Structure formats: structure tokens, C-alpha cells
């Protein structure tokens, strides 16, 4: 059986292995893409895009200067790469899953803004606890929408590893998951092609059933894109080339 090809965008400092394992477990074939990939070099046959966690989105992307109270860990090359990947996905109607930073990237891409340091903006300091990545830091509440259907519950426990957070919502996006202190923790487009979560499901995929459900939903949407591409192109899909191997595209900055 052919599996959909998933472009996984990470930073050079990321540990991509948990994401790769989650994609494979859900039935996808991952391609790991690093910052610096040019728009005209995006693999043309990808069926889905995952924007992983990592450095903060540069505040100039949403019209702000650096907050002196916020960590200044940014990657402008990765920002540019992922903007190009989102452009590509929207043009091709490819599903996108944003995780932590990836969720924030999606929000800013569509014109939203971010809190640069949620712990200094009136939110309880539970969003970056000094705990292992799999530590369940707090609960989130799902409102009616695609994410609630995927997660299968109104309230779930999640981990939390972030400084930034969604402030104003991007155009065309809905905030359908919130933390118990009121911070947006999940976004989605009306058609379900764009999903973003603030937590790290790849780190708790063996601990919380809703994590695997999220990846399975995304892979199933990607499979649908793969099938549609095959129908309209009349060309066999190339995922057999990637099966049983993980392809990395390391582009130097």
C-alpha cells in the first residue's frame, strides 16, 4: 500500500526523531526538510506538511520589535523556508499540521500576532515547566470543531514547551482549543486542511491516545490528497521510493 509523503520542516537544533516516528506510526513516509530550502526546490510530490517546534517566530513577521522580557531565540531562515512551504501547500491544497512553533507560524502567516513571552503577559507559568518533554503540564478544553472531533474529548491533558503564544487570531482561522488559563492552544481552518496545536503530540504519542489520533487524521487527509493527485495526473505515486527510508534534505543556511 502506498503511503503519503510528508514534508517535515525542522530546525537544525531540533531532534526530528520523535516526529519521524509519529509520522511512520500513523502511516506516512517522512521527508525531513531543514532551513534554507528554496521554494523552487520543494519536492513536488509531497502530500502533507508538518511544521515542527523550534525557535520563536521573529516578531517582525507580525509587525513588532523584540520584547525585552522575551527570549531572543529566532531562525529567520527557517521562517522564510516555512512561509514558502505554506504558499506551496495552499496552492496545491495540501494539508498542514503545525506543532508548537508550527502552530504559531500558521497563525502569523494568516495575519495574526503572538505573545512573545506568555509568562509575562498574565498567563500562569505552566506553559514551559522545568520538566521532561512528556510531562503533562495542564489541561486544554476543545470547543466544537475539527480538533474536538479528532481528540475525542472536551478536555485532555497535554505537555507544554513554549514561550510564545497566539495573541490575535489569523484570518480564516478558528481558535477551537484553549488552556485553562485562557490561552489559545489549537487552531483550524474551516475545511480542516490546516490544523495547529500548541503542545507536542509527538512527545506523548505513547502516553495519550489523542496524540496518535491527531497524526492519523493528518495522514488520512494526506492520503486523500495523494489519491486525488494520482487521479488527475494519471501518473503512479512515487512514495514507494521513500518507503522504508527517511529522506533528509539538509540545506545549509
Swiss-Prot record:
Subcellular localization, as worded in the UniProt entry: Cytoplasm; Nucleus
Keyword ATP-binding: no
UniProt domain Glutamine amidotransferase type-1: residue ranges: 5-228
Pfam families attached to this UniProt entry: Peptidase_C26
Keyword Mitochondrion: no
GO molecular function annotation: hydrolase activity, acting on carbon-nitrogen (but not peptide) bonds, in linear amides; ligase activity
Record PROSITE patterns: GATASE_TYPE_1 (PS51273)
InterPro entries recorded: Class_I_gatase-like, Peptidase_C26, PuuD-like
Active site: residue positions: 100, 200, 202
SUPFAM superfamilies documented for this protein: Class I glutamine amidotransferase-like (SSF52317)
Principal subcellular localisation of the protein: cytoplasm
Keywords assigned: Cytoplasm, Glutamine amidotransferase, Ligase, Nucleus
UniProt xrefs under Gene3D superfamilies: 3.40.50.880
CDD domains, per database record: GATase1_2
Entry's Gene Ontology cellular component terms: cytoplasm; cytosol; nucleus
Name of this chain's protein: Putative glutamine amidotransferase PB2B2.05
